[in-house]
A protein has these predicted regions:
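C-terminal boundary motif of the adenylate-forming
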Residues: 52, 57, 90-116
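Single conserved hydrophobic/aromatic residue that forms the stacking wall/gate
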Residues: 1-13
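Conserved ATP-binding/catalytic segment of the ANL
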Residues: 11-13, 17-73, 90
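Active-site loops of AMP-binding adenylate-forming
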Residues: 5-8, 33-36, 115
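Conserved C-terminal "lid"/linker of ANL adenylate-forming enzymes
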Residues: 96, 148-206
């Protein structure tokens, strides 16, 4: 447990990594919403933001994910996937990624190609016919993504690394249901819709 007082604000990093804040600038609760207030504030007046954060020695908080997005491995490790997902999405080939691994020995990921120009640009520059479906099986594409995953893995702890990935042959959009209208990932939808693809990655490892 760690916290820092800064001006009229205290920020605290709980044992589970959740960012909590307290101070004169923080509301005392939700107007005429007792249950919501109880859910958001503890008995000591700390607002539980639901954000996962790392707090440095100077008291600056870096948001690394959302508590509800935590993956808990079979070894009991709590993993916030967003940091590594964001690293991997920097490659122009990649449009979306969803890390998985709840109750599993290691982390895997489902990846979809970028349909907004990035994958097409890469294909043109690398002598590959641009087609999302055929590119998902192209060895040159898979090798490029594997290299990028390896590079991204090197920037996080071993327990946070992606050991396997599956490149899907479709795009994720708000209309197809995997993304919200604001283009946020619907993890529960992905987990349900691609259950077979997810399980296949772990079957291969047995």
């Amino acid at each position: 447990l760690w916290y820092r007082r800064q001006r009229q604000m205290c920020i605290r990093d709980r044992d589970d990594g959740e960012l909590c804040i307290k101070g004169k600038h923080v509301a005392k609760g939700y107007y005429k919403a007792e249950e919501e207030t109880k859910a958001a504030f503890d008995n000591d007046g700390w607002l539980h933001t639901g954000d996962l954060a790392e707090i440095d020695e100077n008291g600056f908080a870096k948001i690394i994910g959302r508590k509800k997005e935590i993956i808990i491995t079979s070894g009991g490790k709590n993993i916030a996937p967003v940091e590594l997902e964001n690293l991997i999405k920097t490659h122009e080939l990649i449009g979306q990624i969803c890390m998985v691994g709840d109750g599993k020995k290691f982390l895997s990921a489902l990846i979809v190609l970028d349909g907004d120009g990035g994958a097409e640009k890469w294909a043109n520059e690398n002598g590959v016919d641009y087609n999302i479906e055929t590119m998902s099986k192209n060895e040159k594409v898979l090798s490029a993504i594997q290299d990028h995953v390896d590079q991204s893995n090197s920037k996080v702890a071993n327990v946070q690394q992606i050991k396997k990935f599956t490149l899907l042959s479709n795009e994720w959009t708000d209309s197809s249901g995997e993304l919200t209208p604001s283009l946020k990932l619907k993890r529960h939808v992905v987990a349900e819709r691609y259950e077979n693809e997810i399980e296949a990655m772990y079957e291969e490892a047995k």
